[in-house]
């Protein structure tokens, strides 16, 4: 089995919160697809709470589109990582990490302005696979933590995995 790009970085020295350029690829027609690692937590030290992560998924996807989509950039998907330390964001275009960080921080502010659980989009049994697995309080705690720490840059070369360690 091939070693995927996400496992070629040393998670023991990865800082968070931070934006990491995970991959850039071209479609057959030449469009650029960019994947960002939006690392909320320091791997193996912190973990996002399950209910808060699910709520964040519902809110973050829309708010990031509000702040980042433009004529040159369109978000395809934002999905939580299985390890619960962040999200992957795939998009058409190549925004700078600074643009991504600014949109992320603005999205966290938006999450803090959500008034009640009733305001979470698609929170019903028809549009959500586990509609009882949500916590606005946890999502807002995550947002407060990100804003308190600030979003930085994660340099792939600085955290390149020394393959002799595995």
Curated annotation (Swiss-Prot):
Swiss-Prot/TrEMBL keywords: Autoinducer synthesis, Iron, Lyase, Metal-binding, Quorum sensing
Gene3D superfamilies the record matches: S-ribosylhomocysteinase (LuxS)
Binding site for Fe cation: 54, 58, 128
Record field: catalytic activity: S-(5-deoxy-D-ribos-5-yl)-L-homocysteine = (S)-4,5-dihydroxypentane-2,3-dione + L-homocysteine
Required cofactor names: Fe cation
An annotated GO BP: quorum sensing
Pfam families: LuxS
Annotated InterPro entries: LuxS_sf (IPR037005), Metalloenz_LuxS/M16 (IPR011249), S-ribosylhomocysteinase (IPR003815)
Biological role: Involved in the synthesis of autoinducer 2 (AI-2) which is secreted by bacteria and is used to communicate both the cell density and the metabolic potential of the environment. The regulation of gene expression in response to changes in cell density is called quorum sensing. Catalyzes the transformation of S-ribosylhomocysteine (RHC) to homocysteine (HC) and 4,5-dihydroxy-2,3-pentadione (DPD).
Protein name as annotated: S-ribosylhomocysteine lyase
Origin species: Campylobacter fetus subsp. fetus (strain 82-40)
């Amino acid at each position: 089995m091939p070693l995927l790009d996400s496992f070629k970085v040393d998670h023991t020295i990865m800082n968070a919160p931070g934006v990491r350029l995970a991959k850039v690829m071209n479609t057959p027609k030449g469009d650029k697809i960019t994947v960002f690692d939006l690392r909320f937590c320091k791997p193996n030290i912190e973990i996002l709470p399950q209910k808060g992560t699910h709520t964040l998924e519902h809110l973050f996807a829309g708010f990031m589109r509000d702040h980042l989509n433009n004529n040159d950039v369109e978000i395809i998907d934002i999905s939580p990582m299985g390890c619960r330390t962040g999200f992957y964001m795939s998009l058409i275009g190549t925004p700078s990490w600074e643009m991504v960080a600014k949109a992320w921080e603005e999205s966290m502010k938006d999450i803090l302005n959500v008034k009640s659980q009733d305001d979470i989009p698609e929170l019903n049994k028809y549009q959500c696979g586990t509609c009882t697995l949500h916590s606005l309080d946890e999502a807002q705690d995550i947002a407060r933590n990100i804003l308190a720490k600030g979003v930085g840059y994660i340099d792939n070369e600085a955290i390149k995995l020394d393959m002799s360690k595995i």
